[in-house]
From Swiss-Prot:
The reaction(s) this protein catalyses: adenosine(1518)/adenosine(1519) in 16S rRNA + 4 S-adenosyl-L-methionine = N(6)-dimethyladenosine(1518)/N(6)-dimethyladenosine(1519) in 16S rRNA + 4 S-adenosyl-L-homocysteine + 4 H(+)
Record organism: Mesomycoplasma hyopneumoniae (strain 232) (Mycoplasma hyopneumoniae)
EC number of the protein: 2.1.1.182
This protein's name: Ribosomal RNA small subunit methyltransferase A
Organism placement in taxonomy: Bacteria, Bacillati, Mycoplasmatota, Mycoplasmoidales, Metamycoplasmataceae
One MF annotation (Gene Ontology) recorded for this entry: 16S rRNA (adenine(1518)-N(6)/adenine(1519)-N(6))-dimethyltransferase activity
Function: Specifically dimethylates two adjacent adenosines (A1518 and A1519) in the loop of a conserved hairpin near the 3'-end of 16S rRNA in the 30S particle. May play a critical role in biogenesis of 30S subunits.
Positions annotated to bind S-adenosyl-L-methionine: 13, 15, 39, 60, 84, 101
Localization per record: Cytoplasm
Recorded family membership: Belongs to the class I-like SAM-binding methyltransferase superfamily. rRNA adenine N(6)-methyltransferase family. RsmA subfamily.
Length: 259
């Protein structure tokens, strides 16, 4: 069988650690579930998913891996799609679970693609760089708290499950990775979510500035004063100091009273 060659331009680091694969699978209820795997690489984790899942759909952008995967998983309950996940369309009405081992450069884009289609999914298990995992689960008043933290925690209950060292991959990455779980919240509203993402993105446009100096780029002084008076904010408050509930209320106030 042809040996897979990792492509640096795609940020490929293939999982090779059986214990990590088993640990990932332990965190998912695979019984009678349809799974989407983003970037199955050599199919190492795919093997473990196929043992328990009803069906696995794998998106793999690297065309050189497709014949290897097709040969390895012949006659299995698996569909391999040679396509960029960012271009994917989802038709099934049954909610699926997503498993992904993502390179740093595309993590946010893929997450927001999933968020935009939230009604199609119920859970994500994501392997990312450890620093990205810290941003996803970050709390207010911490250095890693960001618009990614807010978006992730708005859409789901997020947990950092465990750290994965470089030795678990080929080739070895230079930094640790971590596995994060997203359990999607019930009763999400697409328009409210879109508004929340739009608003919080602008609040964090310049992270080192005060909230006021971020808002001034799309609001006038009178509008900002209306917000500050209603929420009784200190003039020098920064975006990182406000929690998720406050941002939800802020976005709601903006779209119902100012926009």
């Amino acid at each position: 069988m042809q040996k897979p060659v990792p492509k640096k331009r795609l940020g490929q680091n293939f999982l090779k650690d059986r214990k990590i694969a088993e640990k990932i699978v332990e965190n998912i209820d695979l019984k009678n579930k349809e799974i989407i795997e983003i970037g199955c690489g050599t199919g190492f984790l795919t093997n473990f998913l196929l043992e328990k899942a009803k069906f696995v759909t794998c998106y793999e952008i690297d065309k050189n891996l497709i014949p290897i995967l097709e040969k390895k998983f012949k006659n299995k309950n698996l569909r391999i799609i040679n396509e960029d996940f960012l271009l994917a369309e989802f038709e099934s009405k049954e909610k699926k679970t997503i498993i992904a081992n993502l390179p740093y450069y595309i993590t946010s884009k893929i997450l927001f693609k999933i968020f935009a289609n939230f009604e199609k999914f119920d859970k994500i298990i994501l392997m990312v760089q450890n620093e990205v995992a810290d941003r996803i689960v970050a709390k207010p008043k911490t250095p890693t708290y960001s618009k990614l933290s807010l978006a992730s925690q708005y859409i789901a209950k997020v947990r950092k499950l465990f750290v994965v060292g470089p030795d678990s991959f080929f080739p070895k990455p230079k930094v640790n990775s971590a596995v994060v779980s997203f359990d999607f919240r019930a009763n999400l509203d697409a328009k409210e979510m879109e508004n929340f993402f739009w608003f919080t993105k602008r609040c964090f446009q310049f992270k080192r500035k005060t909230l006021y100096n971020n808002l001034i780029f799309f609001l006038n002084k009178q509008q900002i004063e209306k917000i500050y008076n209603f929420f009784q904010f200190a003039q020098n408050i920064r975006p990182q100091q406000l929690d998720l509930v406050t941002y939800i209320r802020l976005a709601d106030f903006y779209f119902n009273n100012i926009f």
